[in-house]
Amino acid sequence: MRKVKPARKLGRTSAHRKATLSNLSTQLLIHKRIETTEAKAKETRKVVEKIITKARKGTHHAQREVFGALRDKEAVRELFEEIVGRIGSRNGGYTRIIKLAPRYGDAAKMAVIELVDYAEAPSAAPVVSKQDRAKRVKGSKKAESRSQENEGGDAAE
């Protein structure tokens, strides 16, 4: 009896799926953080975790295996020279997935996948002071009437 493998197909053929996951993995290793759909992020995590574990061996054979999966010299160099050194003694769990709001347009579930040791501390959102709408909208009747009142009020004092 045929059994289904526990993996997402992502609506693609096997070759297209493999290329997509390879490209997402490459971009994650180069940029340290990417935004994609939740399903792609979860599948990318599986690939990246295995690649980083192989890279931790540091052998020439491991480097060739990783290059076979990524097909990008820059990403392989970044992985072996910088990422592996920074990860150090961490045993797995190299990535983190943060769920985001649904994408506008098709309401697809979105997520950010990032390398754990490269996560930036969240910065406080800039405080924006509210202005009177009449001041923001040039040429509005309210803005003109208020400016005339202020001019008239200055003359009375």
Curated annotation (Swiss-Prot):
SUPFAM superfamilies: Prokaryotic ribosomal protein L17. Gene3D superfamilies: Ribosomal protein L17. GO terms for molecular function: structural constituent of ribosome. The keyword Zinc-finger does not apply. Keywords: Ribonucleoprotein, Ribosomal protein. Coiled coil: none annotated. Signal peptide: none annotated. Residues 124-157 are annotated as: Disordered. GO terms for cellular component: cytosolic large ribosomal subunit. Pfam families: Ribosomal_L17 (PF01196). GO terms for biological process: translation. Part of the 50S ribosomal subunit. Contacts protein L32. Belongs to the bacterial ribosomal protein bL17 family. This is Large ribosomal subunit protein bL17. It comes from Chlorobaculum tepidum (strain ATCC 49652 / DSM 12025 / NBRC 103806 / TLS) (Chlorobium tepidum). The lineage of its organism: Bacteria, Pseudomonadati, Chlorobiota, Chlorobiia, Chlorobiales.
